[in-house]
């Protein structure tokens, strides 16, 4: 994925254009072995394989860890790599990529939300129902979704992203 390109014809001349060069830094990028037995790209590919064949979910899984390993994100914690806040950086990168690839704004908004939220879901499951309900109410009033049905579909997709992501770890 990271080294794939397509040919584009411009003024009667063909040129090679990289499709997703933003993935390049994920190749061989180590993760904390307490949670991951794969490098970031391998984890991403396993997560995609775990997910359903839904375009928004697949894109969210391709892009969910893009922020990992970047200079302003990667830290060493107790001698192990950690990427606090990578989901926000990944979401910003996802928005740029999907916009560049000319996906519709509504689709971009959904995938960006899935990427941005993929780390929030797990801790809330552990802290209890009240915390989860408070978060859902907060998201419902954020203006992110114009209809209740959109919100319900987004949450269902987020569950799928979470399950696919967790299935690609050994946490």
Identify the role of each PLM range.
Residues 1-84:
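Acidic/His-rich, divalent-metal-binding segments that scaffold phosphate/diphosphate chemistry
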Residues 49-170:
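Divalent metal-dependent catalytic cores for phosphoryl transfer on phosphate-bearing substrates
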């Amino acid at each position: 994925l990271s080294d794939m390109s397509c040919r584009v014809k411009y003024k009667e001349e063909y040129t090679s254009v990289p499709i997703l060069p933003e993935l390049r830094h994920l190749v061989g990028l180590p993760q904390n072995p307490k949670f991951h037995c794969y490098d970031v790209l391998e984890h991403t590919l396993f997560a995609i394989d775990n997910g359903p064949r839904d375009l928004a979910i697949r894109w969210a899984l391709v892009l969910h860890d893009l922020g990992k390993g970047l200079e302003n994100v990667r830290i060493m914690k107790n001698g192990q790599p950690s990427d606090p806040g990578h989901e926000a950086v990944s979401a910003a990168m996802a928005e740029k990529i999907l916009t560049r690839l000319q996906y519709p704004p509504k689709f971009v908004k959904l995938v960006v939300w899935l990427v941005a939220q993929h780390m929030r879901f797990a801790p809330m499951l552990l802290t209890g129902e009240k915390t989860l309900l408070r978060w859902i109410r907060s998201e419902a009033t954020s203006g992110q979704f114009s209809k209740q049905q959109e919100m319900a579909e987004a949450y269902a997709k987020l569950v799928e992203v979470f399950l696919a992501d967790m299935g690609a770890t050994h946490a």
